[in-house]
């Protein structure tokens, strides 16, 4: 195989190595699924550090095909005769063939496909590539299922597949049911390659709903948050119930334990971000002092979502669904699978409410006095929805997150510190959002 992966790979939006100096991409594993379809595992080498593995499904044709989008065309291969390689996920026939392999629990070479017990896959549904994914590629099959193909693959048990399977088999109603998956083995380590879940048709993302609510609030200058037509508090209560339900199922199915507060982990992040972001440095000592209050405290931990925010929840006609259980982006797999306090997820949601309210102020600009008035309304919206979320969580679990104020504040600070590092690097204009939150939590 002689495709120009070196040129094509760095242009893909799901490619995760942009912060590193690219060296080469080599097709080390090629599994022929059928005559015109190969599953390719690339080893990507960098000037420094460890290599990474990426998965590409290649559809072959004798000549270029006009109906493929430009992003799908990888290039020409002259090693096995003149032929053109495409990203196969953009070919409906190839995507459908992958679904049939999962449906039959086939094994092709070292690639193992598996259908979950007592499920039906939509083999007659028409596939289309979703435009929503960033780090993976998803193919939607009509209104019935979504096939998520992992691009950067890592060794070990994939938490998205693992936790979806646990929750689905336990009958939890707040996840999209897992229908199937496929994986391989490299150097005696399992590598998850993809998964199929039920598709949440006619759903709305929590982030979009929250933004609509804040837009309505800011547009109605003489109304309070509970008087605006787009009030989100009722949904926040139901969302709190859903998160608590998922936590309860994970705790019941996978167990709980008592461990010390992860002081070393949060201090390491704090040091790293403070070194990189001057705006955080004056407050690093105060944040550390808040963390150290919990140094001798044992906390209850179990498996959690790990990266929960309003963009990871979908509102369907039946209720809220939690999606994407992969954990915090960029963290090693063992960290993403490590049990943590449920306050980690609660803190992620509370931070997301602040972003939903305050990012509109960042984007709109305006005169200082008007912005001050809108900031007060944003704070009102955040407080109302945080309260409703915690009320819902308490109603479903019997545990009110606000009863663990110091622990919750520590996890909120840790999340905000992470956000400071992210915003300083990628969206400097948004840096005031987490910085102001840190000052609020510290009481400055």
Curated annotation (Swiss-Prot):
It holds the Pfam family Mak_N_cap. GO terms for molecular function: ATP binding; kinase activity. It is an enzyme of class 2 (transferase). One of its GO terms (biological process) is trehalose biosynthetic process. The keyword Kinase applies. Monomer. This is Maltokinase. It comes from Mycobacterium sp. (strain JLS).
């Amino acid at each position: 195989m002689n495709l120009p992966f070196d040129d094509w790979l760095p242009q893909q939006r799901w490619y995760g190595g942009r912060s590193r100096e690219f060296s080469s991409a080599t097709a080390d594993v090629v599994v022929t699924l059928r005559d015109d379809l190969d599953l390719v595992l690339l080893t990507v080498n960098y000037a420094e550090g460890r290599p990474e593995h990426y998965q590409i499904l290649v559809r072959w044709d004798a000549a270029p095909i006009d109906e493929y989008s430009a992003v799908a065309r990888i290039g020409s291969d002259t090693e096995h005769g003149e032929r053109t390689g495409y990203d196969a996920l953009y070919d409906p026939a190839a995507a459908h063939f992958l679904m049939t392999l999962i449906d039959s629990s086939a094994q092709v070479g070292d690639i193992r496909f598996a259908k979950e017990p007592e499920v039906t896959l939509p083999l007659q549904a028409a596939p289309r590539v979703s435009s929503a994914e960033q780090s993976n590629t998803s193919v939607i099959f009509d209104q019935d299922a979504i096939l998520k193909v992992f691009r950067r693959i890592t060794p070990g048990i994939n938490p998205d597949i693992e936790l979806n399977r646990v929750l689905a088999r336990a009958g939890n109603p707040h996840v999209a049911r897992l229908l199937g998956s496929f994986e391989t083995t490299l150097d005696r380590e399992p590598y998850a390659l993809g998964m199929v879940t039920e598709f949440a048709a006619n759903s709305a993302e929590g982030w979009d709903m929250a933004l609509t609510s804040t837009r309505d609030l800011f547009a109605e200058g003489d109304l309070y948050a509970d008087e605006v037509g787009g009030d989100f508090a009722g949904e926040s209560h139901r969302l709190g119930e859903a998160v608590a339900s998922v936590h309860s199922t994970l705790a019941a199915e996978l167990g709980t334990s008592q461990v010390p507060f992860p002081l070393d982990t949060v201090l390491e992040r704090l040091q790293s971000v403070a070194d990189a972001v001057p705006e955080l440095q004056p407050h690093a000592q105060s944040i550390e002092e808040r963390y150290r209050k919990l140094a001798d405290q044992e906390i209850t931990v179990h498996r959690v979502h790990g990266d929960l925010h309003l963009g990871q929840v979908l509102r369907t006609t039946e209720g809220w669904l939690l999606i994407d259980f992969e954990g915090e982006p960029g963290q090693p797999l063992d960290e993403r699978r490590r049990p943590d306090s449920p306050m980690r997820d609660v803190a992620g949601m509370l931070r997301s409410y602040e972003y939903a309210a305050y990012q509109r102020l960042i984007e709109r600009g305006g005169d200082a006095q008007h912005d001050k008035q809108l900031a007060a309304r944003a704070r009102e919206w955040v407080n109302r929805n945080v309260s409703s979320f915690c009320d819902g969580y308490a109603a479903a679990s019997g545990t009110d997150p606000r009863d663990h104020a110091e622990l919750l504040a520590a996890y909120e600070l840790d999340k905000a510190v992470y956000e400071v590092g992210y915003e300083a690097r990628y969206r400097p204009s948004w840096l005031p959002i987490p910085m102001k939150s840190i000052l609020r939590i510290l009481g400055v």
